[in-house]
Regions:
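A short, Lys/Arg-rich alpha-helix, primarily the initiator
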Residues: 1-22, 26
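Residue-level detector of alpha-helical secondary structure
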Residues: 9, 54-57
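Residue-level detection of the helix-turn-helix DNA-binding "recognition helix"
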Residues: 13, 39-42, 58
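Recognition helix of helix-turn-helix/homeodomain-like DNA-binding domains
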Residues: 28-45
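Short, basic-rich loop-to-helix N-cap that marks the start of a DNA-contacting helix
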Residues: 41-55
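Short C-terminal boundary/hinge segments that cap the last helix of small helical domains
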Residues: 58-71
Length: 71
């Protein structure tokens, strides 16, 4: 799995006003993990990060395939 960092950045800006802490709280991830993934343009996003994105999308009626590339 690989994240679509452009789509995640849009989600961060549109739903969380660019606030990574709010994004982390909404997804159940550590703020430092979220910051690392965004800072490194998607690198460091493993199964934990992707799983949290999938759960967030299911809870909020979003298509997780917009945010995660399944390979």
């Amino acid at each position: 799995m690989e994240v679509n960092i452009e789509a995640l950045e849009k989600l961060l800006d549109n739903k969380f006003n660019g606030n990574q802490t709010a994004f982390a709280e909404a997804t159940g991830l550590e703020r430092t993990h979220v910051n690392k993934v965004f800072k490194n343009k998607g690198k460091g996003a493993g199964a934990l990060f992707c799983g949290a994105i999938i759960k967030y999308c299911e809870k909020n009626n979003l298509d997780y395939r917009e945010y995660i590339f399944l390979q």
